Amino acid sequence: MYMKNIFRIILLLTTMLFVSCGDDDEVKLPDTKDVNYANIAGSWRLSEWNGKNLEGDTRYYYITFDRKEKDGKRSYTIYTNLNSATSEQIPGSFLLSKEDDYGDIISGTYYYQLDTDDEWEYSYIVSGLTDTSMIWTAKEDMGEMKVYTRCNEVPADIIAGTRASF
């Protein structure tokens, strides 16, 4: 009888141990979306660049993607003051592709001629695409990383070019 009670207590404690070991402590990552023209369409704000949070910074960088193809290309417009004291509006076209070694890639072309050429400096690996954010990592320089946060629209004063940079 004494052995039966000890056995029952051990069985009860073992059961309690397994019941208390749930998955509650696991970090649940948000569901990621497929990287396609429909899922990245819309307006995005650069919120982090190479580990530096840009929240509250007077500098800004917005990019709006149009998923509809026109003349064989899909367009984007950048609104930024990162390289200038005034607001710049930079149009261009972009392309999504998939590479065996890197996965989903976004690359682009500016619609005006730069000093070197009119292609983006880097092609970017797109990862972690959710309803609210996505991460770009430069394929040619893995230390170059950008985090974009989805926004409803680019602020009107930025589109108009009237936002002060200080």
Where does each model-flagged region fall?
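Edge beta-strand at a domain terminus
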Residues: 23, 29, 89-96, 100, ...
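A structural signal for short, hydrophobic beta-strand segments that form beta-sheets
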Residues: 46, 96, 124-128
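Sec-dependent signal peptide recognition
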Residues: 4-12
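Ser/Thr- and Asn-enriched, surface-exposed coil loops between beta-strands
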Residues: 128-134
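N-terminal glycine/threonine-rich, aromatic-flanked beta-hairpin/loop signature
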Residues: 55-106
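C-terminal motif of bacterial Sec signal peptides marking the signal peptidase cleavage site
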Residues: 17-20
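N-terminal helix-cap/turn-to-beta initiation motif at the start of protein domains
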Residues: 28-45, 166
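An anionic, turn-rich surface loop/hairpin at beta-sheet edges
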Residues: 102-126
